Amino acid sequence: MKDGEWIITGEKHFISQASVSDYCVLFAATGEEETSKGIKKRISAFLVDFSDPGVEVAEGYRNVSHRGYTNNILRFNGARIPEWRMMGPEGDGFRLVNEWLGPTRLTVAATCVARAERAFDIALKYASEREQFGQKIGKFQGVSFPLADMATEIKMANLMLLESAWKIDQGSVTAEDCAMVKLYCSEMLSRIADQALQTVGGMGLMEELPLERIW
């Protein structure tokens, strides 16, 4: 720290929507302390204004999927952050990030459920319209049984998500709850997207259908 300002230097990639934002919460090492497990860095949280001197929002990468938002690179070139912008006491950043992490994981889970529902809808519509051997392909058990499994998995994931969201409202959610929901929903999406692609076939890899964005 110098003259009442913290001097931040470093770089962070894959920052969602930074190009359309004015602020971010930054977690940075502000010192070290001796613990029973050895030297540990003190992590503190700051509210950063992207117009602060030394803060640069650079162009990031083009996503294979998730094209509805940008990801950017944040560069801190000796950025000067006023001391009053520290969120909580020095060294409180790790506690804060753990406090926020659970609800944030649920937003990821909710996105996965929504994308899985979209993939299922595309596959179901295709199976209801595409004809082979004189009937809709959805009439074949090799297609209809996987569709039933997909619907069941999505239902299970959504119920897990709703339960944890309810627990947040009640103040009883745990880190384990949120971690399990995110794990199940994200892996569920992978399975649903793959099965939807199998249902649609080669057309699923074409941009004319949005499945390739999900897969």
Predicted segments, located by residue:
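Alpha-helical interface subdomain recognition
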Residues: 5-6, 73-75, 89-94, 98-215
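Short, charged, solvent-exposed linker or helix-capping segments at domain edges/interfaces
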Residues: 36-38, 57-59, 83-90
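Short, ordered beta-strand-loop transition motifs
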Residues: 1-7, 66-68
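Flexible, small-/acidic-enriched active-site or ligand-binding loops
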Residues: 53-80
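Glycine-rich phosphate/pyrophosphate-binding beta-alpha loops
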Residues: 13-19, 65-66, 103-107
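A short core secondary-structure module
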Residues: 4-5, 9-56
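Short, solvent-exposed loop/turn segments at the edges of secondary structure
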Residues: 20-21, 41, 69-71, 101, ...
